[in-house]
Amino acid sequence: FIYRLAGREREKSASYYTPEVLTKCLVKYALKELLKDKTADEILHLTVCEPAMGSAAFLNEAINQLAEAYISQKEQETGEIIGYENRFNELQKVKMYIADRNVYGVDLNSIAVELAEVSLWLNTIYEGGFVPWFNTQLVNGNSLIGARRQVYAESALTTTSKGLHWYENAPERVPLGTERKKKTGYSQIYHFLLGDPGMCSYTDKVIKGLEPDNIKKMKDWNKKFTAPYSTDDLVSLRRLSGIVDDLWQSQIALRKEVEEKTQDALSVFGYADNAEDSHTTIRQKDKIYSALYKSEHMRNAGPYARLKFAMDYWCS
């Protein structure tokens, strides 16, 4: 595949080629401390995320080095050495396992995401192997800007003190597996349920000249976004945050269900995979993902689609 962009397009999309010597060096030293004192099985199950993956240069290098580290450590632990004639195939299997289960990536360029899928497959392909499916792992999006699992303290929504308003401070992250505070008066509210000064803010002189009356109405409307919330507002925000909590947990369970329905079992050197093989084609996996997870062409939206809609609406 040859992917060529003109200079300006390349600059606008931040599409730059990373030389192999650089990816090898950076990945080597990133893994050096991380892999210290880890068992082979721990190495095999490390997850890797590249927030600006491009066509997966760094992901491929991480897979290569993790696979080599796993086999080397497993040989030391078991005392069993893979024969030269089988080593390449066994290495490719380990690379396929890591790519299929533990690799995640995001990129602004949708074409780059498609190229990354092909690149990972070509890097991990082996005789008799399955075609990997990356729909739940490699996505087109912006990893820097957007709604997140972050909250503001309830007190920041009602204060009139300058510098203490929610929109003047960064929200607090709530890691998966931990709960936000829910006690009335001390609860935390998800940031994407709240207004922001940047909403409907137009500074373009041309637009101001074309629609002065509407711009004034929008300015007045914008002021309401950042006004302190009332007691009734807080009741609604607590309820909505509770619904978000439920949707998040349901989405996690749904994701696990999708992964179980689309998973391909793969045992590698020194590790027997106990996952149940889905025996599904790429097309069948796409249908499962579209209907069950994304709720496309379905009468009712599932938890992922509902949560995504709310977060996308805030971003827009």
Predicted regions and their residues:
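SAM-dependent methyltransferase catalytic region
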Residues: 1, 6-8, 12-316
